[in-house]
């Protein structure tokens, strides 16, 4: 992620649920910038469609240069509150960053390929904690499971780190494991039986 987007934002001097609601109705998302070198949190509002476009293009670790009335702030998305019904962003927290610094972030792990016949792949961890140059945060880390047989495990230490990125997570952290297909089916059946028995038990009470 060597590139970043510059987005114009407006300073925000009013607070409270009512004001935030009016901003959202107007297509804006309230947010705040914080960081070690930020003396006081900087409150702003940003166009929702522009924010969503950045999230779609660069993911949850997106870098944004925020232009607030001509003053530019290089930031990284730290947290986005989503509306549970519309899935629109309701609020965004941005971390002030500097070019050249390193940050710890969780990066999605994408497994590719097919394991050996008669096996099933269980992904135990969807993300892995790494340290990366703030302007070179990988959008994802891929690992091929092609041909892996039963009892094979993919550990965090097995993942190839992109340039300017190092592993922070314990190298022994299990990312994925390969099981017999029958074991996976039995586990699913057990879960289904437990789900059926729970309502029956409640009815007996």
UniProtKB/Swiss-Prot annotation:
GO molecular function: 5S rRNA binding; structural constituent of ribosome
Amino acid composition bias (Acidic residues), ranges on this chain: 183-205
An example Gene Ontology CC term for this record: cytosolic large ribosomal subunit
Gene Ontology BP term (one): translation
Membrane among keywords: no
Disulfide bonding pattern of the chain: none
Function recorded in the entry: This is one of the proteins that binds to the 5S RNA in the ribosome where it forms part of the central protuberance.
HAMAP family attached to this UniProt entry: Ribosomal_bL25_CTC
Name of the protein in its database record: Large ribosomal subunit protein bL25
Organism in which the protein naturally occurs: Corynebacterium diphtheriae (strain ATCC 700971 / NCTC 13129 / Biotype gravis)
Lineage: Bacteria, Bacillati, Actinomycetota, Actinomycetes, Mycobacteriales
């Amino acid at each position: 992620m060597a590139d970043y987007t510059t987005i114009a934002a407006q300073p925000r001097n009013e607070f409270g649920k009512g004001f935030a609601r009016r901003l959202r109705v107007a297509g804006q998302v309230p947010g705040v910038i914080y960081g070690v070198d930020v003396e006081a949190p900087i409150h702003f509002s940003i166009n929702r469609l522009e924010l969503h476009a950045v999230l779609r293009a660069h993911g949850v670790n997106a870098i944004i240069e925020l232009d607030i009335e001509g003053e530019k702030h290089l930031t990284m998305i730290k947290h986005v509150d989503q509306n549970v019904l519309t899935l629109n962003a309701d609020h965004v927290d941005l971390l002030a960053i500097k070019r050249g610094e390193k940050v710890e972030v969780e990066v999605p792990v994408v497994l590719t390929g097919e394991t050996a016949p008669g096996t099933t792949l269980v992904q135990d961890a969807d993300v892995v904690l790494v340290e990366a140059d703030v302007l070179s945060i990988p959008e994802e880390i891929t690992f091929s499971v092609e041909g892996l047989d039963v009892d094979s495990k993919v550990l965090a230490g097995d993942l190839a780190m992109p340039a300017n990125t190092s592993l922070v997570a314990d190298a022994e952290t299990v990312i994925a494991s390969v099981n017999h297909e029958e074991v996976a089916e039995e586990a699913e059946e057990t879960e289904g039986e437990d789900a059926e028995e729970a309502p029956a038990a409640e009815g007996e009470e």
